[in-house]
Amino acid sequence: QSTYSKLANFYAFNISQPGIPIIYYGEEIGLMGEGDPGNRRMMRFEINQDERNLKDTFSKLNGLRKKYVSLSLGDQTIIETKGPIFATLKSYFDEHTLLIINQSNKQITTKITLPINGELLVAVDNNHKINIIDNSVILEIEPMSHQFYYVSQ
C-alpha cells in the first residue's frame, strides 16, 4: 500500500510543477520497468484494487490540473519542507492552490503560514473549509497522503 501512496504523492507533486506532467504507460497502475532502465514490461489490463485506486487517483489529479489553472500556469511558492511535510502554493492572478504532502507513516498536524491573504482554505475533494487566521491554518494530514486546497478570498 505504501508504494502506491508514494506514487500518488509523487504524481500530486508532478502535476503542480511547471511544464507538462509526463507519465510513461503503466505508471498509472504502478507497473515496474524491466531489464534496462528505459524498458517496460508488457502492459497489463487486468488490475487489482490497489492498482485501480492508483489509476483513479491519477485521473482525479489530471482533472484538478485542468480545473485549477494555477497548478499549470501559476507562480510557485514553497511554503514548507520540514521533515516529512512538503507544502507549496501555486498562484495565478486571483487563483491560489495549496498542495500539502505528508510523506510519513503517521498523521501529522502542522501549522502553515500563507504568503497571501484569504478567509478560507477549502479542500478540493470534499469542500471541507478551514478558517485562515492571521494568514495561518492548522492542518491534519493523513499518513502517506496529499491534499489540495484552494484559497477563498
Describe every region a protein language model picked out:
Residues 14, 26, 61, 100-102, ...:
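Hydrophobic, well-ordered secondary-structure elements that form the walls
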Residues 44-79:
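Aromatic- and carboxylate-lined catalytic core of secreted/periplasmic carbohydrate-active enzymes
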Residues 11-51:
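Aromatic/acidic polysaccharide-binding cleft in carbohydrate-active enzymes
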Residues 56-67, 86, 112, 124, ...:
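Extracellular ligand-binding/catalytic regions of CAZymes and related secreted enzymes
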Residues 79-115:
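Carbohydrate-binding surface patches
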Residues 113-127:
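Solvent-exposed beta-hairpin/edge-strand motifs
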Residues 133-153:
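C-terminal beta-strand-rich structural cap/linker in extracellular carbohydrate-active enzymes
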Residues 1-18, 81-83:
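Alpha-amylase-like alpha-glycosidases and glucanotransferases acting on alpha-linked glucans and related
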